[in-house]
Amino acid sequence: MQVTLKPVFLDRFRAALCRLGCADDRLLCAVSDGPDSLALLLLAQQILPGKLVAATVDHQLRSESADEAQLVAKICHDLGVPHIILTPEAEIAGNLQSSARAARYALLERAAEAQNCQHIGTAHHADDQLETLLMRLARGSGVDGLSGIRARNGRVVRPLLEFTKAELIEICSSVGIQSVNDP
């Protein structure tokens, strides 16, 4: 698949990676079939050729999740990006959202180690950042307790925090990728 993205998007992404201290390192990119992570994949594929591995976590909580993971595998294959599908060893129990998140990050950490990737890229973006701040404010955090999504947390980096959801959708659309799912 031939990918040509707007130079302004590539420049912004490259600058974000530089600010995060990971412009020259290997990146494990967490990718679902949503536009956010697919845009992350497309940008990283252009800026980090040969230094990128994509990983899709299939929690096996929905009947269509395996097909969605295979769709991502096909996109990665077409882009020439190595891709792995990760599945939890144990059933997700307790608070589903919290348990799934913990399992996902544990799987990504192990995969990054196995793939010799120094960083794990996730697709949190500016709209997520605003939503997080508003939710914390609504819960009564107050100005002193307000904090957004961190751009870096250990080996996890979030280079899209300055991109809007609309821009990420535009990136996908510009190369003919239509996301299937947007959780």
Stretches with model-predicted labels:
Residues 1-183:
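Core alpha/beta nucleotide-donor-binding catalytic domains of modification enzymes
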